[in-house]
Curated annotation (Swiss-Prot):
Protein name (database record): UPF0122 protein M6_Spy0905
Organism lineage: Bacteria, Bacillati, Bacillota, Bacilli, Lactobacillales
Top-level taxon in the UniProt lineage: Bacteria
Pfam families: UPF0122 (PF04297)
InterPro entries cross-referenced by the UniProt entry: RNA_pol_sigma_r3/r4-like, UPF0122, UPF0122_fam_protein, WH-like_DNA-bd_sf
Organism of this sequence: Streptococcus pyogenes serotype M6 (strain ATCC BAA-946 / MGAS10394)
Amino acid sequence: MNTMEIEKTNRMNALFEFYAALLTDKQMNYIELYYADDYSLAEIADEFGVSRQAVYDNIKRTEKILETYEMKLHMYSDYVVRSEIFDDMIAHYPHDEYLQEKISILTSIDNRE
């Protein structure tokens, strides 16, 4: 897998984490098997009794849906920015217990499922 494929896989997995609840069961299953579990199109097609083309089309449509959700809601990009700010604050104020506690609370809110 080349660098671009790895980046796309990581992005799709991240978007899936944020927006999975907005997808249909079929979309969730296909994306999770393809990106998270590294199934091939043929393996997914066999699992669901459909053609590889049907799986491919569904995955491509779902990728666009996930990107559209992100363009409108910015949940993933906002999370990345918050994480970078928290990391920076932790690095610059390692002895400020009050600040560390508040960052910990905010981080736990971001990481709730």
